[in-house]
């Protein structure tokens, strides 16, 4: 049986804490959920706390199996009742909760793996390891995520665990797994832009402009551009260095803007570069799926001849627009051949 433990020292969250939950079921009174950070204890999102607007369909607001942040509005520790609210969660709360949850989950996964290697039996021993390490630092610094930073610090300074009173074998296994599992996490950064040109160059101008941004793509900071629906595009990059990633997209955007202006095209930043949360990822995936379905429908309505004329002139939503493998060159070659004919 797999060992389990809550992520933090306190057994229950406090009122106004924002916590990550997974939806179990939906009933007349509201939605039953598991509090993922508190060893899956049960809570309820009351129907009146799902949305600020009039509820027409619960399933449009919350779905079974979905994971999302909610705020705690009542805790009865004696009876184990926890009431939660979705409508009171702000976008800032979502971002902070998502980041905290990711760090706490990484520590939980690490300590459970260490416990498995050491052959711990029973959740009590896992909690004891938590008490000596993660929860020790949580109480010392009054910060739920400080353990993540200290664990990472131990890669270069193992003495941070000297105050934890760990057995030599436990400390050795812990340090070994931290080095393998807590390397700098890769973060995804995203920006939304609109790029269009209604002049003579048309789609070629758009391709040339986007390619200008993609020329800044490197192995360390790969830049991708996905088509959502003309003229909307999503730019993304993945990196272990958040600041460098944000800067890379900002510079790429300016290159695209400058190139677009050369063609008297239109360019607009819809969303400046920002760190992508789990919710953003899910939203982007849905939009790409929808765009793919719409493109497939349009493609099905066109005859083969029309499709041949437009080869290389549209982006595949499932593939990044890459300057090394774009269809722009192929399209231009075909146009030249047609002119010769």
From Swiss-Prot:
SUPFAM superfamilies: eIF-2-alpha, C-terminal domain, eIF2alpha middle domain-like, Nucleic acid-binding proteins. One of its GO terms (molecular function) is RNA binding. Transmembrane segments: none annotated. The modification Phosphoserine is found at residue 51. Residues 16-87 form the S1 motif domain. One of its GO terms (cellular component) is cytosol. Its main location: cytoplasm. Keywords: Cytoplasm, Initiation factor, Phosphoprotein, Protein biosynthesis, RNA-binding. Residues 293-341 are annotated as: Disordered. One of its GO terms (biological process) is translational initiation. Phosphorylation of eIF-2-alpha impairs the recycling of eIF-2 between successive rounds of initiation and thus leads to inhibition of translation. It is found in: Cytoplasm, Cytosol. Pfam families: EIF_2_alpha (PF07541), S1 (PF00575). Eukaryotic translation initiation factor 2 eIF2 is a heterotrimeric complex composed of an alpha, a beta and a gamma subunit. PANTHER family: EUKARYOTIC TRANSLATION INITIATION FACTOR 2 SUBUNIT 1 (PTHR10602:SF0). eIF-2 functions in the early steps of protein synthesis by forming a ternary complex with GTP and initiator tRNA. This pre-initiation complex mediates ribosomal recognition of a start codon during the scanning process of the leader region. Belongs to the eIF-2-alpha family. This is Eukaryotic translation initiation factor 2 subunit 1. The lineage of its organism: Eukaryota, Metazoa, Ecdysozoa, Arthropoda, Hexapoda. The gene is eIF2alpha.
């Amino acid at each position: 049986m797999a060992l389990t433990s809550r992520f933090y020292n306190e057994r229950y969250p406090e009122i106004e804490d924002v916590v990550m939950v997974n939806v179990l079921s939906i009933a007349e009174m509201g939605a039953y959920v598991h509090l993922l950070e508190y060893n899956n204890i049960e809570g309820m999102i009351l129907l009146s706390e799902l949305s600020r607007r009039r509820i027409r369909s619960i399933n449009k607001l919350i779905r079974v199996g979905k994971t999302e942040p909610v705020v705690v509005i009542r805790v009865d520790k004696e009876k184990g009742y926890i009431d939660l609210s979705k409508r009171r969660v702000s976008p800032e709360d979502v971002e902070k909760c998502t980041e905290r949850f990711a760090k706490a989950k990484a520590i939980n996964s690490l300590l459970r793996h260490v416990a498995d290697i050491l052959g711990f039996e029973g959740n009590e021993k896992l909690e004891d390891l938590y008490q000596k390490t993660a929860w020790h630092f949580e109480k010392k610094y009054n910060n739920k995520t400080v353990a993540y930073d200290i664990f990472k610090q131990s890669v270069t300074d193992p003495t941070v665990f000297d105050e934890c009173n760990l057995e030599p074998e436990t400390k050795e296994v812990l340090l070994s797994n931290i080095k393998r599992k807590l390397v700098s996490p890769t973060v995804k950064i995203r920006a939304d832009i609109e790029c269009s040109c209604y002049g003579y160059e048309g789609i070629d101008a758009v391709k040339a402009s986007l390619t200008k941004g993609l020329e800044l793509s490197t192995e360390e900071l790969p830049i991708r551009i996905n088509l959502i629906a003309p003229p909307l595009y999503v730019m993304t990059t993945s990196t272990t260095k958040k600041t460098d990633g944000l800067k890379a997209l900002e510079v790429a955007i300016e290159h695209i803007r400058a190139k677009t202006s050369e063609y008297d095209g239109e360019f607009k930043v819809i969303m400046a570069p920002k760190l992508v949360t789990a919710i953003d990822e899910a939203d982007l995936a849905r939009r790409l799926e929808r765009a793919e379905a719409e493109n497939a429908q349009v493609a099905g309505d066109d005859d083969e001849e029309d499709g041949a004329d437009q080869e290389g002139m549209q982006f595949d939503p499932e593939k990044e627009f890459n300057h090394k493998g774009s269809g722009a060159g192929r399209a231009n070659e075909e146009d030249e051949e047609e002119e010769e004919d």
